[in-house]
Amino acid sequence: MKWKLAAMFLGVSLALAACGGGGDNAGEKNGGSNGGGDTAAAAEQIFKQNCASCHGQDLSGGVGPNLQKVGSKYSKDEIKNIIANGRGAMPAGIIKGEDADKVAEWLAAKK
């Protein structure tokens, strides 16, 4: 019984470590710009850098839920709130400010 509990704890710890702690450096990698005028491309890049490890490169899910049709369930403001405050195992504030707004808008369009 102790080994099952230890294995479960280790698995959950590894999953949470994979999802969090990326820092707020999405804009730093390209001189503070997230793709110029193309907001959708910039949002997708921010997502891939900060969220894809849990939600999948194609939004199909994994450790985190499937987001392929998240816009049919949540509005942009609701998605932005989830990004800011976290939900379930998702840590709060992985993406902040304008980057969070871009990603929320991009995800809200996924219907």
UniProtKB/Swiss-Prot annotation:
Task: Please tell me one Gene Ontology term that the record gives under cellular component.
Answer: plasma membrane
Which topology term describes how it sits in the membrane?
Lipid-anchor
What biological function has been recorded for the protein in this entry? Appears to mediate electron flow from the cytochrome b6f complex to an alternative terminal oxidase.
Single GO molecular-function term?
Answer: electron transfer activity
**Where does the protein end up?**
Cell membrane
Its post-translational modification remark reads: Binds 1 heme c group covalently per subunit. The N-terminus is blocked.
- Which segment of the chain is annotated as a signal peptide? 1-18
Residue numbers with lipid attached (S-diacylglycerol cysteine)? 19
- Presence of keyword Heme: yes
Disulphide connectivity of cysteines: none
InterPro entries registered for this protein in UniProt: Cyt_c-like_dom, Cyt_c-like_dom_sf, Cyt_c_BACSU-c550-type, Cytochro_C551, Cytochrome_c550/c551-like
**Binding site residues for heme c:** 51, 54-55, 90
Give residues with lipid attachment (N-palmitoyl cysteine).
Answer: 19
Q: What is this protein called?
A: Cytochrome c-551
- The gene for this chain is cccA
Q: Which UniProt keywords apply?
A: Cell membrane, Electron transport, Heme, Iron, Lipoprotein, Membrane, Metal-binding, Palmitate, Signal, Transport
Asked whether the UniProt record includes Membrane among its keywords, one would answer yes
